[in-house]
Amino acid sequence: DIGFKYGYLEIRAKVSEGVGSWSALWLLGKNLADGVTWPACGEIDILENTGSHPFQIQGTIHGPDYSGENGLTKIIQAQKPLSEDFNNYAISWNENSIEWFINGVSYNKISKTDPALVGKDWPFNQEFYLIINLAIGGWFPGEVDPELVQAELQGTG
């Protein structure tokens, strides 16, 4: 039952390849265990990548009134497919903002004073727990390539 609240969190990972794969490194509010529902509990996506967009790095926050397809998202393109090498995915998080990094380079920062958040809750001032997962298929990655018979999300220590 490990929780994180603020600081710098970095994960070295190599995402899966293959159309239909969905690699994700994310945080979910620990108050979910107390009955607070999503998205009110908050979600911080450190990285999402689908095999159908092998160059794409996506970092997002979800909260009340800005969740799912309406999450606050920044998408950038890597210079080569993310499945070719290990990369360092990170966030720097404090009571007022969250900043995303790829290999030490900042690519997005969202603060609770962001115009898109005016009048909306900022559920990121609590403990969160880490989820590292690989999914196959679903609404986000789309249809699965029939040739995709093996997928792996790798990490290093």
Residue ranges and their predicted role:
Residues 1-157:
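GH16 jelly-roll
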